[in-house]
Curated annotation (Swiss-Prot):
Residues reported in the UniProt entry to bind iron-sulfur cluster: C52, C116, C118
Domain of life per record: Bacteria
Family matches, as InterPro entries: FeS_biogenesis, FeS_cluster_insertion, FeS_cluster_insertion_CS, FeS_cluster_insertion_RrpA, HesB-like_dom_sf
Homology family: Belongs to the HesB/IscA family.
Listed GO biological process terms: iron-sulfur cluster assembly
UniProt-recorded name of the protein: Putative iron-sulfur cluster insertion protein ErpA
Cofactor note: Binds 1 iron-sulfur cluster per subunit.
Length: 124
């Protein structure tokens, strides 16, 4: 039996999805926007320096979309990410969890090499 050496080819399934915005997160944001009474609001997710691990996530509502923003719409909710933050969030999942510890938005980020105990700070 002859073995033929083949060059390793990258598996296209290993390429991370640009970003996952779960139904749970989109539905919670939709509820919060309705409570604010301003249908023009969009959720802006960003990364900034700080926290115990070097970077931290931030969430805010914004009416404006900037030229360099990446936008994603799910369940009628628009998510905005600026170009600097996007590079740190490629492949991440933005979710909303409710459990005995409380309710919070959670980012599962494959780019983070370490995260702190609070889950809002990370390093790459």
């Amino acid at each position: 039996m002859n073995a033929v050496a083949q060059a390793a080819t990258p598996d296209v399934n290993e390429v991370p999805a640009p970003l996952v915005f779960t139904d749970s997160a989109a539905d919670k944001v939709k509820q919060l926007i309705e409570e604010e009474g301003n249908p023009e609001l969009k959720l802006r997710v960003f990364v900034q320096g700080g926290g115990c691990s070097g970077f931290q996530y931030g969430f805010t509502f914004d009416e404006d979309t900037n030229e360099d923003d990446t936008t994603m719409t799910k369940n009628g909710v628009t998510l905005l990410i600026d170009s600097m933050s996007y590079q740190y969030l490629v492949g991440a999942e933005i979710d909303y969890k409710e459990d005995i510890n409380g309710a919070q938005f959670v980012i599962k980020n494959p780019n983070a090499s370490t995260t702190c105990g609070c889950g809002s700070s990370f390093s790459v």
